[in-house]
């Protein structure tokens, strides 16, 4: 079977995350001599380039060439994360949603409608839509009730992340924060100023060069956050980036990551951070739109980001107490190890070994 894996998407998915999932799929399928993998795309990370160089069963191919090849073959299937390949309608399509239009803030009504329409089209067209964990399964089945029979959880753990030696991590910090240690924060725009106030308290306490790096969902939010930053006393210690520009090295090099009001689209980032021994902090305030599922509550530390002094105290704690920070990271690692062991022993679909061409 020729398995075409598309590396583009209509939806907002960090490039590093999407390409890591492509790597995970192929690594889990290399044991089969019946599958030849075609990675469709360009400007791919070194991890996928190396995978092709070291495996005869892997070929990187540009989209135009893939469109030509798909017309010439008879035994093929397509895996995608929200994309199309011209000329492939006669073959089985498998949709792996890593995000959903409702997870993207700030969309215009027309843009959100267009993305939702595309999402439903992929659901309808797919032979099966595979989710990567029970959080995504619950969310998508509740939202797209018409397609619940197509939506099912698959076994697709992180297989192998890039290994960064301390020199590479130091380079990442130099590029991002001029060498300063930093916290990484996924914070909604409407809570941005509140976190700045808490970070100010921490900076006044500690007199440190620690930096707070915010990751927003799109360039529009980045621009709005930058306008709110005008006049902030510790402006030089704040960095603002879009998730589309985020690199895996940023995760691997951070002190800790703060997640506020997250959707299932951040679950892969959670797993990656844990693999890199990074402790996680979750907002468990009762006013959140979606609470952290019970099965994921041991992945990190939970407290209310809205409680006065809560964030500033945790900034201080993770900055000053390395033993505590490492202990929290180990707790996350233990949780993820147990989760993967449990999933491996259940009757989940194994991607790509269980896929068929029609």
Language model features: what each stretch is:
Residues 3-7, 175-193, 199:
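Conserved donor-binding/catalytic core segment of Leloir-type glycosyltransferases
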Residues 6-21, 191-193:
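A short, glycine/small-residue-rich beta-strand->loop->alpha-helix junction that serves as a flexible
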Residues 17, 319-353:
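A charged, aromatic-enriched C-terminal amphipathic alpha-helix characteristic of glycosyltransferases
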Residues 51-61, 223-243, 297:
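Nucleotide-activated donor-binding/catalytic signature segment of Leloir-type glycosyltransferases, i.e.
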Residues 76, 127, 251-265, 278:
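Acidic donor-binding loop of glycosyltransferase active sites
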Residues 112-129, 253:
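Membrane-proximal helix-turn-helix segments that form the acceptor-binding/catalytic region
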Residues 124-150, 158-163, 224:
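A short, active-site helix/loop in glycosyltransferases that binds the activated sugar's phosphate group
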């Amino acid at each position: 079977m020729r398995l075409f894996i598309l590396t583009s998407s209509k939806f907002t998915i960090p490039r590093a995350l999407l390409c890591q999932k492509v790597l995970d799929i192929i690594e889990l399928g290399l044991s089969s001599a019946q599958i030849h993998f075609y990675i469709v795309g360009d400007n791919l990370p070194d991890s996928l380039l190396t995978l092709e160089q070291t495996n005869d069963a892997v070929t990187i191919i540009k989209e135009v060439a893939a469109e030509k090849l798909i017309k010439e073959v008879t035994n093929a299937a397509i895996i995608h994360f929200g994309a199309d390949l011209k000329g492939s309608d006669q073959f089985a399509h498998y949709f792996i949603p890593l995000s959903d239009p409702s997870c993207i803030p700030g969309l215009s009504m027309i843009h959100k409608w267009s993305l939702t329409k595309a999402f439903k089209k992929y659901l309808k067209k797919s032979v099966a839509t595979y989710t990567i964990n029970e959080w995504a399964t619950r969310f998508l089945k509740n939202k797209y009730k018409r397609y619940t029979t197509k939506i099912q959880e698959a076994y697709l753990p992180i297989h192998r992340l890039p290994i960064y030696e301390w020199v590479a991590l130091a380079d990442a910090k130099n590029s991002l924060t001029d060498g300063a240690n930093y916290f990484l924060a996924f914070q909604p725009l409407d809570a941005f100023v509140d976190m700045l106030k808490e970070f100010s308290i921490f900076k006044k306490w500690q007199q440190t060069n620690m930096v707070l790096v915010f990751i927003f969902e799109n360039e529009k939010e980045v621009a709005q956050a930058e306008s709110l930053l005008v006049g902030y006393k510790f402006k030089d210690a704040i960095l603002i980036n879009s998730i589309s520009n985020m690199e895996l090295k940023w995760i691997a090099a951070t002190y800790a990551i703060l997640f506020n009001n997250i959707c299932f689209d951040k679950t892969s980032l959670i797993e990656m951070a844990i693999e890199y021994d990074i402790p996680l902090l979750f907002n468990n305030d009762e006013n959140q739109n979606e609470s952290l599922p019970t099965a994921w509550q041991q992945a990190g530390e939970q407290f209310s980001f809205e409680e006065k002094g809560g964030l500033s105290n945790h900034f201080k704690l993770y900055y000053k107490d390395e033993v505590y920070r490492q202990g929290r990271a180990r707790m996350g690692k233990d949780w993820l190890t147990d989760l993967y062991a449990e999933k491996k022993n259940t009757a989940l679909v194994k991607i790509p070994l269980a896929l068929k061409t029609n």
